[in-house]
Amino acid sequence: MKATDLFHVTVLVAGALALEHQQPLIGDLSQDLNHIIDSSPLLSFHRALVQIPSISEHEKNVGEYVLDFLSSQNLTVEKQIVTPESDTEEERFNIYAYVGKNRQPDVLVTSHIDTVPPFIPYSLHAPTSDTSFIRTDLVIAGRGTVDAKASVAAIVFAALETLDENPNASIGLLFDVGEENSGVGMKHFSNSELNPTPPTYHTVIFGEPTELSLVAAHKGTLGFKLVAEGKAAHSGYPWLGESAISSLIPVLAHLDTLQDLPPEKGGLLRSETLGKSTLNIGRVHGGIAANVVPAHAEAAISVRLAAGTPEDTRTIIERAVAKVTSGDRSVYPDFGDRKAGAPPQYFDVDVDGFEVITVNYGTDAPALKIHDQRTQRVKRYLYGPGSILVAHADNEAITVGELEEAVRGYKRLIAASL
């Protein structure tokens, strides 16, 4: 790839980055803020991504934008259709890009283009009420500014700059759909011809908000329902029925203590790296009216696994339920597909110059089957700009400085992997 083919992206970004040490901005604030974004291809691309709503199952428009942009940079771009595996008829697709005919590159860099609801419009904010500030402190707010359109934008420009400096760099880009609710995009890629055995890539770099640190590990996941079956009756004669809600409550109360119980006493598993497994009772519903003894009740529960497998945790849950119910099957855990869930994930952190942390959230990483060989292990890195603490919140936001630093961080990871 030639520098001219990139529409001078590298030169423009370098110029924008050089502004980092300029004097504080004073003047027409709104004009200054928009000028900062307009003058940077990176920030302009990020703005365009965020301005296009892409809540899970509705990623088509932002996907088309990313596809067109990558094509304009002389990359070979494929649209990997995943619609038949979804609950919506709207077209859904992953975007897979690479240089020339190098369809199976050495290094795969990936993130997701879907977001959680609701859509929050893009906006710019000075870091303080004062009109004087440094451009790198400018705050960019809106849904997806962090999770994960910041990673998408930084990955794209890190790849373009790398290819401008080294046209033979063997890099592939994957931007998938559905990470926030089902993992359908990564699962589809994982089961496709683009993920062969043995693997053609030797490194995968996952883009998620990590506060610009390398992640050593993140917790696994397990979701299930606790179900109680009772018998309906008039509330004036409750002894004629069996309240499913009353049966559910003591079991829920016990499950809620498992994260604090030591494993040897029936509690959830722990590890030195990730600490305690945690359990969250996220939703409870049951009954049809206040004057009817409820015949059915259930709770939706999520466990973040610090150790062991999902099956290990299922066993702990089953034993805990049986302890309270004395084996009464009118209250039971419903795990659905027992193949669902994921164990804790561990990543490589052997590139110098990064802080190393662990995180409690989940990613697409377990959905990508890594076909390690006896003589070659595929390395996995997890890195990205922004904080998970605001990623799904009303105040989701990132600074210009974080976004620009992420480009440099991804370039270092790519360079170390080539």
From Swiss-Prot:
GO molecular function ontology, one term from the record: peptidase activity
Keyword field contains Transmembrane: no
Keywords annotated in UniProt: Glycoprotein, Hydrolase, Metal-binding, Protease, Secreted, Signal, Zinc
Entry annotation: catalytic residues: 179
PROSITE patterns (UniProt xref): ARGE_DAPE_CPG2_1, ARGE_DAPE_CPG2_2
Cofactors (names): Zn(2+)
Glycosylation sites: 74, 168
InterPro entries, A to Z: ArgE/DapE_CS (IPR001261), Bact_exopeptidase_dim_dom (IPR036264), Peptidase_M20 (IPR002933), Peptidase_M20_dimer (IPR011650), Peptidase_M20A (IPR050072)
Alphabetical list of Gene3D superfamilies matching this protein: 3.30.70.360, Zn peptidases
Gene Ontology terms: biological process: proteolysis
Binding site for Zn(2+) 2: 147
Cofactor: how bound: Binds 2 Zn(2+) ions per subunit.
Main location: secreted
Cellular component annotations (GO), alphabetically ordered: extracellular region
Residues at which Zn(2+) 1 binds: 147, 180
Range of residues in the leader sequence: 1-18
Localization annotation: Secreted
Enzyme nomenclature, EC number: 3.4.17.-
Protein family (similarity comment): Belongs to the peptidase M20A family.
Protein name from the UniProt record: Probable carboxypeptidase AFLA_000940
